[in-house]
């Protein structure tokens, strides 16, 4: 995969576009029944109107079967979809919007966009580069001030055009929201097919919006509980085959995998440490289920919990000093926090119902969880001390939250009622209002949202 950021001045030289050779301005530095705390930051139900016409091209060329004019429309489509999906923006275009010429990329008609109610406008271009590459440039403007806010340029291989669109959307989102980016990231999950009693479960990977989908495993073994490594390069997951339980690490670049540990005892829920050197997992031995820590290179595991009962679902804090997990030692599933050596185990959930599948936010400020009660499973968040509980979803069975790289959006899977209940992937932001379903070719469960790609 190749996506090389370049300056737009270099992009202009590479594409030899005299219309853009002029100097550019320098960019300036579901209804809930429970009360919610105020969320600090930019999350809001008010959306910024933003114009996004198709990207221009100096001359129509075909690169690796892609016409640059058609690709200009596709780039704008992906950027518009990304921004709209964030819940913060209301895109105008590219459908129903006049196509711009190359000379207009750096000379927007601000009055035209203001008349349509757009506070900002995105312009861009795509051209054939050297040696079969593509050059993509994108700009963000403030229509009221008539000023440039963002400029980005990339030299890419044609297969990576969607990544260029996500990178542009990330730059726009970050500039206007003040939040860290999250669009140019990937999701690993379990693709499910077949009857409920004999499900085929395969490890799969896709872009954060469902694009570029591919299956990793063939379905001969049951795949469960995938999790991206902090550097995105690997995925740890559990494989069940012939009464053997194995924890594998899959290398995303090479497509190879290696064994971390195996057992005939039920083993599940592997999780990476923030530095990528350690893995947590849960294993049932002699009627007791406990949390273990093992080197990512394998070796002898260290048992962290010893209380009678079931202790599962460990997740590291971003600083690597704490672990949140679930335990039924009190008589029902509740959340606990402990030090990484297993000491100082403290219960943090005290609301009604049972709590499970905790996941620490990459920002460190919240823990996402599944709460079970009244015949329903719902996704919520709380502070690491157990305060500020907010429920974000109202589905019949929503579970297994995973955080976006910037800690502002949560993905999970939802199962429909009935004997043949179908599972699908969803996401919701911290307002609990912006609920979306992710497209997948099959049923999906147990998502893992990876970090932003370099």
From Swiss-Prot:
Signal sequence, renumbered to the chain: 1-21
Listed InterPro entries: 6-blade_b-propeller_TolB-like (IPR011042), PD40 (IPR011659), Tol-Pal_TolB (IPR014167), TolB_N (IPR007195)
Keywords: Cell cycle, Cell division, Periplasm, Signal
Subunit structure: The Tol-Pal system is composed of five core proteins: the inner membrane proteins TolA, TolQ and TolR, the periplasmic protein TolB and the outer membrane protein Pal. They form a network linking the inner and outer membranes and the peptidoglycan layer.
PANTHER family, A to Z: PROTEIN TOLB, PROTEIN TOLB HOMOLOG
Similarity comment: family membership: Belongs to the TolB family.
Protein name (database record): Tol-Pal system protein TolB
Gene: tolB
């Amino acid at each position: 995969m190749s996506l090389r950021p370049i300056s737009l001045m270099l992009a202009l030289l590479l594409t030899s576009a005299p219309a853009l050779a002029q100097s550019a301005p320098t960019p300036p530095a579901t209804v809930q029944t429970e009360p919610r705390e105020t969320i600090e930051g930019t999350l809001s139900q008010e959306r910024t109107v933003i114009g996004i016409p198709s990207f221009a091209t100096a001359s129509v060329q075909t690169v690796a079967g892609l016409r640059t004019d058609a690709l200009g429309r596709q780039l704008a489509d992906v950027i518009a979809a990304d921004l709209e999906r964030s819940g913060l923006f209301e895109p105008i275009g590219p459908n129903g919007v006049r196509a711009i010429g190359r000379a207009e990329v750096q000379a927007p008609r601000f009055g035209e966009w203001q008349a349509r109610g757009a506070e900002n406008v995105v312009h861009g271009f795509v051209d054939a580069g050297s040696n079969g590459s593509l050059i993509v440039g994108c700009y963000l403007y403030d229509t009221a001030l008539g000023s440039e806010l963002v400029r980005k340029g990339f030299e890419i291989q044609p297969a990576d055009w969607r990544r260029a669109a996500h990178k542009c959307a990330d730059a726009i989102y970050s500039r206007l929201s003040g939040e860290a980016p999250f669009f140019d990231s990937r999701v690993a999950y379990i693709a499910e097919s077949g009857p409920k009693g004999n499900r085929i479960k395969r490890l799969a990977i896709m872009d954060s919006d469902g694009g570029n989908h591919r299956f990793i495993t063939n379905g001969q073994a049951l795949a469960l509980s995938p999790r991206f490594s902090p550097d995105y390069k690997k995925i740890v997951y559990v494989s069940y085959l012939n009464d053997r339980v194995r924890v594998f690490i899959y290398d995303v670049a090479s497509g190879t995998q290696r064994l971390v540990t195996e057992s005939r005892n039920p083993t599940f829920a592997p999780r990476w440490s923030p530095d990528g050197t350690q893995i947590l997992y849960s294993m049932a031995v002699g009627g007791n289920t406990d949390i273990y820590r093992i080197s990512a290179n394998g070796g002898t595991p260290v048992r962290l919990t010893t209380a009678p009962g079931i202790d599962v679902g460990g997740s590291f804090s971003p600083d690597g000093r704490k672990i949140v997990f679930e335990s039924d030692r009190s008589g029902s599933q509740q959340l606990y926090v402990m030090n990484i050596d297993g000491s100082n185990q403290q219960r943090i959930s005290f609301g009604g119902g049972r709590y499970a599948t905790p996941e620490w936010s990459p920002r460190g400020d919240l823990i996402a969880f599944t709460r079970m009660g009244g015949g329903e499973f719902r996704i919520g968040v709380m502070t690491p001390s157990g305060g500020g509980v907010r429920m974000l979803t109202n589905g019949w069975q929503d579970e297994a939250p995973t955080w976006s790289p910037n800690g502002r959006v949560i993905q999970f899977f939802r199962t429909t009622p009935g004997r043949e209940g179908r599972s699908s992937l969803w996401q919701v932001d911290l307002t609990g209002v912006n609920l979306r379903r992710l497209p997948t070719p099959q049923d999906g469960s147990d998502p893992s949202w990876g970090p932003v790609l370099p």
